[in-house]
Structure formats: C-alpha cells, structure tokens
C-alpha cells in the first residue's frame, strides 16, 4: 500500500488567490497600509486576524538603545552645565531614536549588543553659526557602527556654550517593549543609565472581518488588516515577517500524527472548455442518474437543470423540504464525476441566482440551433 493511501481527503478550503495591499487614505504607504484577504472560510477571518495581530505586535525584532553614558552625568536627575535639556529629557529623546539594521545570518556581528562612542566637540564658531544654540542630533551620535537612523534629525540635546564630551550608547536587538528594570547588563558601567527599550517597529495593528461572497454564497469572510509601523520596516515587510514567525511556531504541531490531509482542489472553469461546461449545465436533472428520492427533492424545489443545481450553495439546498444530508452526499458525488460542484460561480456566463432558469433555457436553445445548423 502506498503512503498516499494513509492520507485523509478533506474538502477544499476557499482561499484568496492573493492578498491585496492598499494605502490608508492620506497616509504614506511605507508606514501605513491596509491588507485585504478574501475569500476565507467562515471563522477563519478572526482566527488569522487575531494571530497575525499578536505576531505583528510582539514578534518582530529591531534594535533599540538600552543604555547611555555621558561625560559629567552621574545620574538621571541632574542638569548639565551648558546643555538646555536635563538628563531626564535627554533620556526621553534617546527613547525616540528609531534605528535600522538587520543582522544577517552570515554576518560576523550577528545579534550581539554593540557599544557606540561619539565625541561631541562644539566651539564658539559652531555656536555662532547656530545663533547660540547648537543642536546635537541622533545622527551626530552614530559616528560608529553601521546602524541607520530613520529619524536622524531627532534632537538629543542642545548646547549653549563651548563643550567637549563623550556619549556612549549601548544598542541591542529585541522584541516588543522591555522596561529598564528587566534589562540586565553584565558589564554595566558605574554611571551608565539603563533605558526602557521599545524594540517593536510596529506601532498599531487593527483588523476587522466582513462578509464576502463566492459565487452566490455569502457565507465567507473578508479579513481587513490595518498595519502601522514607525518606518524601520514597511507594513508589507512586517506582515511577511510575522507570517514566517507564525509558520515557524505552527510547524511544531504538524507532526503529531502520521496521517496527512490532502485537500480537494476547487473546480476551475478555465481549465475546461466553456462549451463542454455549458453542455453539462443545460442537462436536465432527469438526464443524470440520481435516486428517486434526490430527483423528487430537486423537482419539489423547482430545480430542473444542472445549471440551476450547481449555482446553489450547499446550505441553501439543505433548506429545501425533505432534502437531507444523504441526498446532498449523493448529489455532490454525482457532480464530482461531472467535474462540477455546488456553489459554482457562473457569472462569466452571465448567470446568477436571479436568472439561472431563463439563462439555461436560452443556452439550451442556442446550442440546439447551432447543432441543427451544423
């Protein structure tokens, strides 16, 4: 017996062909985007939306400043001569630093914590050129290393007199948000001040689920996911990374049973000649081999042709009087033999639930006339 004989055969799941990315009105798409996935089976919108939201908010890594030291700074509650901001405000400004750098697998640095030193030297001419107040920005502090600042013009402190000092930054990689009391530095300097670290590049994730349709069946989900980032990653990158994180975690549950599930594929009209499909759709119900019970059920529901049958969603068929799961199973198997299925989208033939009976008659007459002429 082949390995495939042990596989379980499941009915197909409706899945989107692709995820659409759209801008959020009035906002730049490199930081704000809307993603739409449809159709999804009922309930899968919330299942995927909630999982992706959590992974986006807590799973993505980015660098952040976790500590700093500065010449003459003994603690965070002091003022510095010749500097407008006190140390508390300098800390707040450092927390607003948005750093980019992704450790590559083949990089010698990897994910190690890095210490960057910057020498700041401001003389009278610098002050004169700046009207007496020289701003020191984030870019001025990134003299070493290969970190890129998304907001390089972020002001860290402002100098009002000639000064020479050294600023030391310790930068680490992490996820989410880590308060300073949870950051442990083994080689912490005596006057090194540890900061709260906001690692996550994702600032906001919202999602909602709407109804959508497949053919005439509206019992499907449309997932709308709104992602906002701080610019260190794009929303598209963030969604791709979070999906990989979830896939990694789901994989640990995959091999709990030797049996595998094989999903049936949806019927695609494009794969078959349209004329062949039409010849099947105009067939009368009495022209295919169904049990008397199933035939009578369809007749009582005023379903006369295969076209009228296949356009019906499965739940709607079950609403007809005396139509049970046994008849449903028989009909689905018969349609499968014909390479058809319930709930088919016949819009490319101009056929909907509101006109299917008339359209089937029109197509039958058209094909009959063509055969006579031929």
From Swiss-Prot:
The gene is rpoA. The keyword Aminoacyl-tRNA synthetase does not apply. NCBIfam families: PRK05182.1-2, PRK05182.2-3, PRK05182.2-5, rpoA. This is DNA-directed RNA polymerase subunit alpha. The N-terminal domain is essential for RNAP assembly and basal transcription, whereas the C-terminal domain is involved in interaction with transcriptional regulators and with upstream promoter elements. InterPro entries: DNA-dir_RNA_pol_insert, DNA-dir_RNA_pol_RpoA/D/Rpb3, DNA-dir_RpoA, RBP11-like, RNAP_asu_C, RNApol_insert_sf. GO terms for molecular function: DNA binding; DNA-directed RNA polymerase activity; protein dimerization activity. The keyword Iron does not apply. It catalyses: RNA(n) + a ribonucleoside 5'-triphosphate = RNA(n+1) + diphosphate. GO terms for biological process: DNA-templated transcription. GO terms for cellular component: cytoplasm; DNA-directed RNA polymerase complex. Belongs to the RNA polymerase alpha chain family. Its EC number is 2.7.7.6. Keywords: DNA-directed RNA polymerase, Nucleotidyltransferase, Transcription, Transferase. DNA-dependent RNA polymerase catalyzes the transcription of DNA into RNA using the four ribonucleoside triphosphates as substrates. Homodimer. The RNAP catalytic core consists of 2 alpha, 1 beta, 1 beta' and 1 omega subunit. When a sigma factor is associated with the core the holoenzyme is formed, which can initiate transcription. It comes from Chlamydia pneumoniae (Chlamydophila pneumoniae). Residues 274-374 are annotated as: Alpha C-terminal domain (alpha-CTD). Residues 1-257 are annotated as: Alpha N-terminal domain (alpha-NTD). Signal peptide: none annotated.
